[in-house]
């Protein structure tokens, strides 16, 4: 009877066969990525496939951090590593040690991926660009402390304005440490707040040599800067992420200095030109005002001003006399109307009635009695006459008109 093996035995045996295979121990495979998953641990799990087959792959975090691009489903790649068996599931898979795009370079893909990402976030939008000051007091320069770049910037700066202050923040401009140093330099210049504009500069080079200026950390530090930033990386045909996010791009470091530093000779020439134009404009204005003043002086009023004043004074006197006459007439009419009203009121006075022989009767409460219904027998009444007062007691009351 044949020997009976466990599943683990067979899987382990197959693993040993595969692991000892000289081809499978170091292999590069071309395929299209599918089912890509970037685990929170940093590991990458995916499948590469062609028209007829597929192969499961895993890339652990220690290798994944070295990738210059972000793998995506549908991307054609060349994956290098070794084939082994995952004993638990009995599946063979490729353990990837490196990966690169098939055809287009990894750096180029990484560049396009980051560019698209930052563009979606609005880091390149024109409305977010800050204006470069016309007359900066000092300029910060983020570049290497040695080489042609800093010399060119210094030469151009002092040729255009010998009194301009330059603040150099030296950094590495290529290599693994460069991106972090550049971002930190921009941050520090903002914290110190002693410069009015920042130039981030580097000379020409390959995509790999310029790569620090394509790193996301540099792009975000430029975007977060409160101080305007001019990018001057590489030659005129070189474009970096730094160029897109900066407030202004210069084709070369020398051009950046020309954009940041105003030419004092040109400024003085413009100032003199403005001064001459202002004097000319002021002279024309004075001449115009003199002509207007002469025309005014030629008018009769200004030629004989006292005659005009006397005429107005006579007019004022006439108006005053007219107003006095009108007021006197109005007062006279009002006095007459008042006298007539006083006469009417006097005729209606109770005292006038008493003078004509009539009398006035009041009850004990002091009210005038004008009908017998207000009187009761026994009431004491006051009778007012023109020449005195009489008090009487009511002994009888009769209703009816006694004079009919």
UniProtKB/Swiss-Prot annotation:
<dbReference type="InterPro" id="IPR016102">
    <property type="entry name" value="Succinyl-CoA_synth-like"/>
</dbReference>
<dbReference type="GO" id="GO:0005737">
    <property type="term" value="C:cytoplasm"/>
</dbReference>
<dbReference type="GO" id="GO:0003676">
    <property type="term" value="F:nucleic acid binding"/>
</dbReference>
<dbReference type="Pfam" id="PF13742">
    <property type="entry name" value="tRNA_anti_2"/>
</dbReference>
<comment type="similarity">
    <text>Belongs to the XseA family.</text>
</comment>
<keyword id="KW-0269">Exonuclease</keyword>
<dbReference type="Pfam" id="PF02601">
    <property type="entry name" value="Exonuc_VII_L"/>
</dbReference>
<dbReference type="InterPro" id="IPR025824">
    <property type="entry name" value="OB-fold_nuc-bd_dom"/>
</dbReference>
<protein>
    <recommendedName>
        <fullName>Exodeoxyribonuclease 7 large subunit</fullName>
        <ecNumber>3.1.11.6</ecNumber>
    </recommendedName>
</protein>
<keyword id="KW-0540">Nuclease</keyword>
<keyword id="KW-0378">Hydrolase</keyword>
<comment type="subunit">
    <text>Heterooligomer composed of large and small subunits.</text>
</comment>
<dbReference type="InterPro" id="IPR020579">
    <property type="entry name" value="Exonuc_VII_lsu_C"/>
</dbReference>
<dbReference type="InterPro" id="IPR003753">
    <property type="entry name" value="Exonuc_VII_L"/>
</dbReference>
<dbReference type="GO" id="GO:0006308">
    <property type="term" value="P:DNA catabolic process"/>
</dbReference>
<dbReference type="GO" id="GO:0008855">
    <property type="term" value="F:exodeoxyribonuclease VII activity"/>
</dbReference>
<dbReference type="GO" id="GO:0009318">
    <property type="term" value="C:exodeoxyribonuclease VII complex"/>
</dbReference>
<comment type="function">
    <text>Bidirectionally degrades single-stranded DNA into large acid-insoluble oligonucleotides, which are then degraded further into small acid-soluble oligonucleotides.</text>
</comment>
<keyword id="KW-0963">Cytoplasm</keyword>
């Amino acid at each position: 009877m044949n020997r009976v093996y466990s599943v683990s035995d067979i899987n382990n045996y197959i693993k040993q066969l595969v692991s000892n295979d000289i081809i499978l121990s170091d292999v590069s495979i071309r395929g299209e990525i599918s089912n890509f998953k970037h685990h929170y641990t940093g590991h990458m799990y995916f499948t590469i496939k062609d028209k007829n087959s597929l192969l499961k792959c895993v890339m652990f975090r220690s290798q994944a951090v070295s990738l210059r691009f972000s793998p995506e489903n549908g991307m054609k790649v060349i994956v290098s590593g070794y084939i082994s068996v995952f004993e638990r599931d009995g599946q063979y898979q490729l353990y990837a040690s490196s990966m690169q795009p098939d055809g287009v370079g990894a750096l180029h893909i990484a560049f396009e991926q980051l560019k698209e990402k930052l563009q979606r976030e609005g880091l390149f939008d024109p409305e977010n660009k800050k204006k470069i000051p016309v007359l900066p007091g000092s300029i910060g320069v983020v570049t290497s402390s040695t080489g042609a770049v800093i010399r060119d910037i210094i030469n151009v700066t002092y040729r255009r304005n010998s009194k301009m202050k330059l603040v150099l923040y030296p950094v590495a401009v290529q290599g693994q440490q460069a991106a972090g140093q550049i971002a930190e330099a921009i941050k520090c210049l903002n914290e110190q707040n002693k410069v009015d504009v920042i130039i981030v500069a580097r000379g020409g080079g390959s995509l790999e040599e310029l790569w620090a200026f394509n790193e996301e950390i540099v792009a975000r530090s430029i975007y977060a800067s409160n101080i305007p930033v001019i990018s001057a990386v590489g030659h005129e045909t070189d474009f970096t992420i730094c160029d897109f996010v900066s407030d202004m791009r210069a084709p070369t470091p020398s051009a950046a200095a020309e954009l940041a530093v105003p030419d004092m000779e040109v400024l003085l020439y413009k100032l003199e030109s403005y001064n001459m134009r202002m004097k000319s404009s002021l002279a024309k204005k004075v001449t115009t005002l003199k002509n207007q003043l002469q025309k005014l002086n030629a008018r009769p009023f200004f030629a004989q001003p006292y005659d005009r004043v006397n005429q107005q004074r006579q007019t004022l006197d006439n108006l005053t006399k007219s107003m006095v006459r009108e007021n006197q007439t109005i007062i006279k009419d009002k006095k007459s109307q008042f006298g007539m009203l006083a006469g009417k009121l006097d005729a209606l006075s109770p005292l006038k009635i008493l003078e004509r022989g009539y009398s006035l009767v009041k009850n004990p409460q002091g009210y005038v009695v004008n009908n017998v219904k207000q009187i009761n027998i026994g009431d004491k009444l006051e009778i007012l006459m023109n020449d005195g007062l009489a008090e009487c007691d009511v002994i009888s009351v009769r209703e009816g008109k006694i004079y009919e």
